[in-house]
Structures are given as C-alpha cells and as structure tokens.
Amino acid sequence: MNSTRNIISLVRRYSTSRSVKIASHGSPSTALKIENENITDKISNKDVLVEMLHAPINPADLNIIQGTYGTNVQVGGVAGMEGVGVVKKVGSGVTGLKENDLVVPSMKQHFGSWRSKGVWSEQQLFKVPSDIPTEYLSTISINPTTAYLLLNDFVKLQQGDVIIQNASNSMVGLSVIQLAKARGIKTINVIRDGSEFEDNVQRLKQLGGDIVVSEEYVRTPAFRKLISDLPSPKLALNAVGGQSATELSRILADNGTLVTYGGMSREPVTIPTSQLIFRNIQIRGFWLNKWFEQHTDSEKQSVYDAIFDLIRKKQFKLLIEKHKFSEFDQALLKSQQSGHGRKIVLDLQL
C-alpha cells in the first residue's frame, strides 16, 4: 500500500514539457531540435512554475539561432525571447506572484519561451493584466515596446509633427504607425516594392499610415512633391540600412535624428558628410536588450501600460497568425517568408 502511494506521489510531481532547443548555431531549419523533458512540481522557494500559452517567432529569435545576434544563447538552450504564460505554482518565498497570474519575461536575460512549461525565478517574470488577449501579451515585450521607445526616447514629438520610417510593414513599423496616429503624429512609410505592394499599402493605410511609398519612389522628384505640403520629418527610423537609410537622412529636417534599430539589408548605414556638417543630422542606434538592462521595472510598466491602454481603446492592434506548437516546422517556415504581414505566434498548448 505504501509503495502504491509513493508511485502516485511520484507521478504527481512530474509533468512533460515540450521545448525547442538550439542544437547548433546555423540555419533555423536545421539547427533546432524538439525535445520532451520532465518538469518537477517541487520547486525552490524563489521559483515559479509556468505553463506557457503563446510565444511569437521574431527575427531576433532567428538571429540568435543563427549565432548573429548581439547576445549569445549556448547550444542546448531553449529558443524564444518572449511569450506569455500562466503561473501554476509558486515557491514559498515568492511574494509578487500567485497562481493563475499571467506573466511575460522580465527581459533582463534570455528567457527560452518556446516550451509548453518551465520553471523560472520570480525575477525572470513580469506580471501582466488578464484583460488583454494572451496572443497580444506574448508579443508585447519586443515589437510594440520598441516602437513606443523609438517614438519617445530620441526626439520630442508633438501633434502635427512628421516622422519617416522604412521596413514599415514589419511588426515594429505597424506598431509605430498606430502609436504615432494616437498622438496625432503623421507617418511617411517606406516599404519594398513587390507582388504584395498594393496589399501592403492598403494594410498600412487602414492602420493609420498617412503616406505609403516604395523604396524606389522615395528617390524620385515626384516623392518630394508628394510630401512638400508636410513639415519635414524630425525623426527617421531605420531597420534596413544601406541606400534606404541614406535616403531617409536626406529627407529629414535640419537637426533631425536618424535612429537605426535593425539592419535587414546587412549593408552599413552610410550618411553623406554634407548631411552631418551642413544639416547637423544626428545618427543614433537603439537596442532593446540594452534598454531593459538600464531601466527599472517601474519604467517598463509605464511603457506597457501606455500600450495596454491603447489596446483597450481599440486604437492599437497586432496582426497575428497563430500556429499549433505541434506544427512548429510549418510555423518556422512561414515566419521566414516575407510579405505575409502577420506575426507568427505559437499556441504552446496545442
């Protein structure tokens, strides 16, 4: 009888978690492996057992797998920078969280969100409200937060001001459009030409983009005429680099600021000397990981609250395409295809 109780007790202490691990650094299609592992319910006093609900596949996740990101995740680590989960159990020393709370990563270090269940310390988790859709919460830490900080941390923008950005149909770009619209800031949005160009133009304008043009059109006199009635942009947001970044700098107002937060073209940001000397164009860089390292939880909460408020007012939405965790390979492939205009989010319980 006692042995039977021990077996039952043992079964109750363990559950299986499926996770996506980095087997090697290289192409995401070959560098990952899916494993099942046992997760114990017996956790230390400062730890929290979390059942993960959703996690997106971000470009930064793919860069980490490739070994080309600014931070390195060791081989054998679980992939995924952000996501959302529900607290299932807390250690005796945990004071800020309780069962059934929703949590996202604190973003102080790599999280490893592509798993169905995991144990983290309380300091690695950040509580979020339950009235926001969980698929939205899973993406809040990176793209919307980046967009918010780009609009707030570099130039003092007021209603009626103008900004210009490339990669405008990225998730950061779509977030910038909506956050700017909510503040009465006009956006000039540059996107790549291609078979989905007209669909992307329609999508961006529906979200509030004022002007949407192709990379090629920006270089024409017709573009200058198109924007001639607008104030010159005070801020340019660059996620591409190369010639695209150069063109953004030429459109900026004198004393304007070009902020680079990505390099999709893998080409250097090259600004003509005349832009620096005669027009005092400011060149800045932004890396979200560094921002999280240097700012407090209270400052992070303020950013999240501002975004949550717009979501509640239906002034901000995320274009999301959900995929079952059991169909991870298809989701990974879709995330690497350009032009679909939606964030791929894993449903980690399916």
Curated annotation (Swiss-Prot):
Mitochondrion in keyword set: yes
Feature: transit peptide: 1-14
Gene Ontology CC annotations of this record: mitochondrion
Active site annotation, chain numbering: Y69 (proton donor)
Enzyme category, top tier: oxidoreductase
Record's catalysed reaction(s): a 2,3-saturated acyl-[ACP] + NADP(+) = a (2E)-enoyl-[ACP] + NADPH + H(+)
Biological process terms in GO annotation: fatty acid biosynthetic process; fatty acid metabolic process
GO molecular function, one term: enoyl-[acyl-carrier-protein] reductase (NADPH) activity
Annotated binding of NADP(+), by residue: 143, 169-172, 192-194, 261-264, 286-288, 343
EC number, as in UniProt: 1.3.1.104
Signal peptide segment: none
Keywords annotated in UniProt: Fatty acid biosynthesis, Fatty acid metabolism, Lipid biosynthesis, Lipid metabolism, Mitochondrion, NADP, Oxidoreductase, Transit peptide
Localization annotation: Mitochondrion
Quaternary structure note: Homodimer.
Protein family per UniProt: Belongs to the zinc-containing alcohol dehydrogenase family. Quinone oxidoreductase subfamily.
Job description of the protein: Catalyzes the NADPH-dependent reduction of trans-2-enoyl thioesters in mitochondrial fatty acid synthesis (fatty acid synthesis type II). Fatty acid chain elongation in mitochondria uses acyl carrier protein (ACP) as an acyl group carrier, but the enzyme accepts both ACP and CoA thioesters as substrates in vitro.
Name listed for the protein in its UniProt record: Enoyl-[acyl-carrier-protein] reductase, mitochondrial
Originating species: Dictyostelium discoideum
Lineage: Eukaryota, Amoebozoa, Evosea, Eumycetozoa, Dictyostelia
Gene encoding the protein: mecr
